UniProtKB/Swiss-Prot annotation:
EC number: 4.1.1.23
InterPro entries in the record: Aldolase_TIM (IPR013785), OMPdecase_type-2 (IPR011995), OMPdeCOase_dom (IPR001754), RibuloseP-bd_barrel (IPR011060)
Catalytic reaction annotation: orotidine 5'-phosphate + H(+) = UMP + CO2
The UniProt record lists the keyword Lyase: yes
Record family assignment: Belongs to the OMP decarboxylase family. Type 2 subfamily.
Example of a GO biological process term: 'de novo' UMP biosynthetic process
Enzyme active site: 96
Keywords: Decarboxylase, Lyase, Pyrimidine biosynthesis
Pfam families, per the entry: OMPdecase (PF00215)
SUPFAM superfamilies on file: Ribulose-phoshate binding barrel
Name of the protein in its database record: Orotidine 5'-phosphate decarboxylase
Length: 274
């Protein structure tokens, strides 16, 4: 999916919502535990309930890998179900990979050849040769970690050099030498607030994947005020605030209502550019 197609989906749905599929076997409704594949059963119900109101899904690999083979099978089934039934949805493998070149090449092969996923999150710490293997696939996206929403972002990402330049700013500037805004996005946490203004000075045209609204306390209005550009330029993720709002047999309907509420807020924000 290219950048224009992504924007067309945003305009059509009046939404830039990504639903995070951080599916924890300990948090899903009890009645699903009797299913032969409870993780997939949960994901399928969530996807069916929310697809009208979002433009992307983001399975977090840690939640699937923690369950071994069964978890990976559920992940693959989820990806295939979305592709077959909702082909306009942008799929993000939230894997945060990044290693020496030949290892990254294997990660890239997994997500882009075997699974044919649209994008994967990548950690930039090891530099260009750890990222470029992911960039060799036409039509696929790298979503590079830039400024995250966790407290630990202060340990490295927000540290300044002698000239006052912060590490995340170096990442943004240097990585633009590796790919353009048709193949690279950046992760920027919603809790970073005014930092979006500084980020847009460096990457005015790139899409930003923004986790951290909802349960993590980020402000959608603030993200849009400082981060939205003429093609929206935002994919805002909500996980717990949608998928875990209800643990009864009505969980899917509750998730749909939560997604609809976020979509309606996003539709208001999009009026500034549509």
């Amino acid at each position: 999916m290219n950048k224009q197609s992504l924007f067309e989906n945003i305009k059509r749905k009046k939404s830039f919502l990504c639903v995070g599929l951080d599916t924890d076997i300990k948090k899903i409704p009890d009645h699903l535990l009797d299913d032969s594949d409870p993780i997939f059963a949960f994901n399928k119900a969530i996807v069916d309930a929310t697809a009208d109101y979002c433009i992307a899904y983001k399975p977090n690999l840690a939640f699937y890998e923690s369950m071994g083979v069964k978890g990976w099978i559920a992940f693959e089934k989820t990806v295939n179900y979305i592709k077959e039934n909702y082909p306009d949805q942008f799929i993000i493998a939230d894997a945060k990979r990044g290693d020496i070149g030949n290892t990254s090449a294997m990660y890239a092969r997994t997500f882009f050849e075997e699974l044919d996923i649209d994008s994967v999150t990548v950690a930039p710490y090891m530099g260009e040769d750890s990222v470029t293997p992911f960039l060799s696939y036409e039509g696929k996206w790298v979503i590079l970690l830039a400024l995250t929403s966790n407290k630990g972002s202060h340990d490295f990402q927000l540290t300044e050099d002698a000239n006052g330049e912060r590490l995340f700013e170096k990442v943004l500037k240097k990585s633009q030498e590796w790919a353009n805004d048709e193949q690279m996005m950046y992760v920027v946490g919603a809790t970073q607030g005014r930092a979006f203004e500084d980020i847009r000075k460096i990457v005015p045209n790139h899409f930003l994947l923004v986790p951290g609204i909802g349960a993590q306390g980020g402000s959608l209005e603030e993200v849009c005020k400082y981060g939205m550009n003429s093609t929206c330029g935002l994919i805002v993720n909500s996980s717990r605030g949608i998928i875990y709002v209800d643990k009864t047999e009505n969980f899917a309907a509750a998730a749909r209502a939560a997604a609809k509420e976020v979509q309606e807020q996003m539709a208001e924000q999009l009026k500034a550019i549509l």
